[in-house]
Amino acid sequence: MACTTVNVGSCVWVEDPEVAWIDGEVIEVKGSDIKVKCTSGKTVAIKVSSAYPKDVEAPASGVDDMTRLAYLHEPGVLQNMKSRFDINEIYTYTGNILIAVNPFRRLPHLYNNHMMQQYKGAGFGELSPHPFAVADAAYRQMKNQGISQSILVSGESGAGKTETTKLLMQYLADMGGRAVSEGRTVEKKVLESNPVLEAFGNAKTVRNNNSSRFGKFVEIQFDQRGRISGAAIRTYLLERSRVCQVSDPERNYHCFYMLCAAPPEDIKKWKLADPRKFHYLNQSQCIELERMDDAKEYRETRKAMDVVGINSEEQEAIFQVVAAILHLGNVEFGKGKEADSSAPKDDTSNYHLKTAAELFMCDEQALEDSLCKRVIVTRGETITKCLDQESAALSRDALAKTVYSRLFDWIVNKINDSIGQDPDSEYLIGVLDIYGFESFKTNSFEQFCINLTNEKLQQHFNQHVFKMEQDEYNKEEIDWSYIEFVDNQEILDLIEKKAGGIISLLNEACMFPRATHETFAEKMYQTFKDHKHFSKPKLSRTDFTICHYAGDVTYQTEQFLEKNKDYVVAEHQTLLNASRCAFVASLFPLLAEDANKKSKFSSISSRFKQQLVTLLETLSTTEPHYIRCVKPNNLLKPLIFENQNVLQQLRCGGVMEAIRISCAGFPTRKKFEEFLERFSVLAPEVLDKSTDGWPLSSTDDVACKKLLEKVALQGYQIGKTKVFLRAGQMADLDARRNEVLGRAASRIQRKFRSYLSRKTFLMLRKVATNMQAVCRGQLSRLIFEGLRRDAAVLEIQRDIRMHLARKSYKELYFAAVSIQLGIRGMASRGRLRFQRQDKAAIMIQSHCRKFLAQLHYQRLKKAAITTQSAWRARLARKELRKLKMAAKETGVLEAAKSKLEKQVEELTWKLQLEKRMRTDMEESKTQENAKLRSALEEMQLQFKETKALHLQEVEAAKKMAETVPVLQEVPVVDTELVEKLTSENEKLKSLVSSLDQKIDETEKKFEERSKINEERLKQAIEAETTIVNLKTAVHELQEKILDVESENKILRQKSLIQASGHLPPTPVKGSQNGHFSSKESPFNGSEIETLARTQEQESDAKTRRYHLDRQRENIGALINCVVNNIGFNQGKPVAAFTIYKCLLHWKSFEAERTSVFDRLVQMIGSAIKDEGDNEHLAYWLSNTSTLLFMIQQSLKPGATPQQKTPVSTSLFGRMAMGFRSAPSSAETSAAAEAAAAAVIRPVVAKDPALLFKQQLTAYVEKIFGMIRDNLKNELQTLLSLCIQAPRTSTGRSLRSFRSSKTMRNNSPLDHWNGIYDGLNAILSTLQENFVPPVLIQNIFIQTFSFINVQLFNSLLLRRECCTFSNGEFVKSGLALLEEWCNETTEEYAGSSWDELKHIRQAVGFMVIHKKYRISYDDIAHDLCPILSVQQLYRICTLYWDDSYNTRSVSQDVIANMRVLMTEDSNNADSSAFLLDEDSSIPFSADDLSSSMKEKDFAEMKPAEELEENPAFSFLI
């Protein structure tokens, strides 16, 4: 895509021997020759065909996909990669190919879990390039299309292939992994196989500290659901020669150094020492590596072995074999006793030989013989041949290489067996980590095999790239012709052709015993002397050169024959097969063919060739994905980009070949809107225009076609969504566009100069007008000042005249008032004197009348007292007779009392029996009620009979009293005693009447309850309450009767003593009126007390059982009531208040054991199962938070309940105390007011209450999190659409951005309006359910923080979002959120607006004009103080102005940021530029309580449903 036509001032790329390509400006054009002034300062003269056009409008930070480059050529690709590498963007797409540049430093923010979550499900190319995107695309295609996939990772040593493979396997394991509960052993073993294989297959080379010395193909198998079901690891061509030969400054395999750094007990067990003392390790001066701890790696490797299924015994055996190889390498050989023989050189060699034999667990002498001798078997005899020193050393090295190779193969097979392969697997994803193309100063057999592999893969790669090009053209439905590409089949035939290929000749030479590398080279020279891809170097007799696709490579044939032979010495096979160690013996099994033939030749090249055929067959059945790893420099240091080195790797990796294939067709592809936006200035008249000048009716493809026809361009193609241009056509269009823009610039300059001149004229005219206005104003002010002075003089004169007249008037007024005052005072004093005289006369008359009236009253009072005394004496004597008759009634009442007690006990027992059997014996309940009713009627009849008997006895006593003559003159000896007896009798009568009344009430209640069968529980409770009251009344009556009886007895005795002097003794039987003496009494005091105590104990046991049953029923009723939405009262939840009042009344907080808390927790847990109903969740959040607040206030530390007064243990004592302590109505009302004023009172809580408080706190936090997460999920979909302005076509997008109206109903802000409405909806829901403001505030603060994180991270991950127009769009959306925060009170919004500080500052920076004038200090301290250097750097490098095409910040600012980032590169936290989401609970129970202290529950009303339940009467 060289330049065809250039003009002076055009920017081009020219070749440079130092930096490969350098840009410059054309300063002279002479035909086909041009002069270019380079940016380095030098001027070069070149042909036009040697220069390549430069895209001056390309973004400074490069593009994600190099197919989007305007000019797809080598310098453009190289510059794009270098620009991205400078801003730590190490990944770039070339179509579907990912190019990865090794940064040689840790970038943890690119590979954390958050980044992995970003790429899950994202479309390929939607986010920044990343290996996760390639792995996700492969996984999605596998699941959606049902086709197996493969990912090929290639690159030279040190390019980062192994690390990239780890990332791919990590992502695939996460995507296809099972849940933790199902066990994730397969994917864990796949991941942990990497450190094991690295320990035994990786080593330090000149180019890489952790170079893989083997090829690896990992097959990850998946089931139909896309879960990993198995895996297999295939390895290729382990570099066996490294075990014995190491060049400086390289190292041997890592496992040798790890073993030498093992714990002391392992070192002692295997007799190890410092690595410098072992021959296989001290050939190089490099023993230790920076940033690598061998001891730590040893421990990590052992752990990884445990995970992949290698048990501890097998691990011990593995490292025992590795230690044996080290000791074997220290065995040196000297001359033996016989000629041409060898033997261990000294005691040190004998020690290591003995140690190696002990570790191999074989015979020491047999090991020595296998190294120093060979047994030749002929037809008739067996000949033992001694080996010389050199041959013995080669035999030793051969044994070491064979043992290590067999050990490595065993580890790979063990890992495969442990992971397991799924025979029913539907699909697989293969990850190929293969060595890249190699060309060194000395290239041996390993480089030959490696380059053969790359030739095969390059052929597969070219075919895939060609297929992608065809798919792209077919997708866009354009006409295309066959595209030629370089086919390397001739090179492959040269190497691997069955008859006459290099591998065939090599195998043939290995079969001949006398063949050497000279004969092999001579055979190749003769066979391929005419082949165009094969040549012989001039200065060498045995070397040969092959022209590979990546360049010419010269191979040295000295060791080709030895390295191609793959056979085991018969003595070594026999020796180790007979080892006492089962593990060592299993490495060398004795095969049937080995028994027949002592040594069998097999070709490594043939086996490797067969492995490649199998690999390519597997790859051909899969959909390939390519990752090309690039090493930026050979120093292995960060921030260094060597152009020549990178360009060579791009050529070797086939990237340039892929670009060449693209250039052969249509290298430039632009979307319609991008093409019109860039080149619409060439032919604006071909577009249909509306009133505002933008396309209206014509579509973008028609506009593009008209534009290209207008400029007379040939060879282009119009697809469905893109314009396809031939090579060089983009440069031609750019040249024409620059001419149009130049003319437009001149026109703009002319208009601008005219504008400046007019502005100057208008300014001068305005200044003259202002000066005239100032002069006229000064003259007017002078005239106005004279007029104002005249008006002031007149005003002063008027005020003085008014003051004089007012002063004269006041003097006359005060004189008249003084005269009137004197006359009126004299008249008033005369009237006062007359009134005093009149009052004195009246006072004298009143005292006289008072004396006469008082005298008359005293006389009447004295007469009345005399009359009253006589009458009271008569009444006292009559009352005494009544008391005597009442004493006779005591015995009858006592009998009635005992009968009532029996009836009460029987009634109590029947009620309890009814309660137990009420669920399954409804008929029995009716019978029991009838029995109770009949019992009550019988008791009432008995009471009436007792009462009638009492009346008869009273009448009889009256008749007897009438027959006995009583002297009227007997005086009352003790008046106080009579009054006391009278009062006691009155109380007794009142108690009897109250008992009668209560019995009547009980009868009425039973009659009412019998009509309602559904309310059986309430009937039992009220009946039992009535019975308890009856028992109390009966006991009270019993005590009062005993007291009255004793007092009547004393009074009767006194009366009889007083009347004995006048009346004859009359014998009266004690049984006639029911009165007995103390000895004959049927119930004395002790018996009554014992009987009462027994009844009390039985009653208490029954009462406890009854209370437990009733409490369970009450809890069920409470839960059935509050589980429904019973609303709010005075802005507070009724359910929480009702629950708290019940818990407080039932004393559940002070109980050691109770089930009420468990049932409440279960009720709350089942109520919030519907996680998506925010209305329901808000209701329960309000209730749980309020209940938690009330419990928090009650269970405060240091709270002590009121001390209880001691309760008497005696039944009669408790009854008496109840009568004595019964509160008056005033006291009752005062207590009620105190209780209402203090609903929440402190209690001492036990463990169940404290546990319930913790569980309630957890539910508050859970419901809070559910509402918050529901809101986040609702906003998630809208946020993904709010980060980028809608863009359907060029005209439409430009119109929307140039529109001056930004009302809320505009279509670009629909998604922001959705967020606005969603916030209002959740706020109204929370307010309607009276959720505490502190919880609402925290919900919105965390939601705004979530919005900030999502928008800011999307801004940093997607370059198309970092534009000027998109910044304006996001800023308008943020204005809506600010409007919402302003409309919402601070009580609910809080600091929500401050949570958007990152996205606000980022968007504010994006919409600033003339960013190139802003310094770094202004950005970091004034504009964006909250953003880190990494975040600012990424925004500045990703930003591009799609509206005005202005520049971003200056290069000095970018350089300053880069220096600061380099200084912080070692800090993992500082290098992370993405924000993390905060999902913690931002409040505690104390915070909730402190915010709700002002709530008053004094006038709260409980649930209406419970008010009708008598058991909850305490709520009213």
Curated annotation (Swiss-Prot):
Domain IQ as annotated: residue spans: 741-770, 764-793, 789-818, 812-841, 837-866, 860-889
Annotated segments matching region Disordered: 1061-1085
Domain notes: IQ domain mediates interaction with calmodulin.
Entry binding sites for ATP: 155-162, 208-216
Keyword Nucleotide-binding: yes
Disulphide bridges, residue numbers: none
Function: Myosin heavy chain that is required for the cell cycle-regulated transport of various organelles and proteins for their segregation. Functions by binding with its tail domain to receptor proteins on organelles and exerting force with its N-terminal motor domain against actin filaments, thereby transporting its cargo along polarized actin cables.
Region (Actin-binding): 494-528, 530-553, 588-612, 612-634
GO terms classed as biological process: actin filament organization; actin filament-based movement
A cellular-component GO term for this protein: myosin complex
The protein's name: Myosin-14
Domain of life: Eukaryota
Pfam family, one: DIL
Entry similarity comment: Belongs to the TRAFAC class myosin-kinesin ATPase superfamily. Myosin family. Plant myosin class XI subfamily.
Subunit description: Homodimer.
Biased composition (Polar residues): 1069-1084
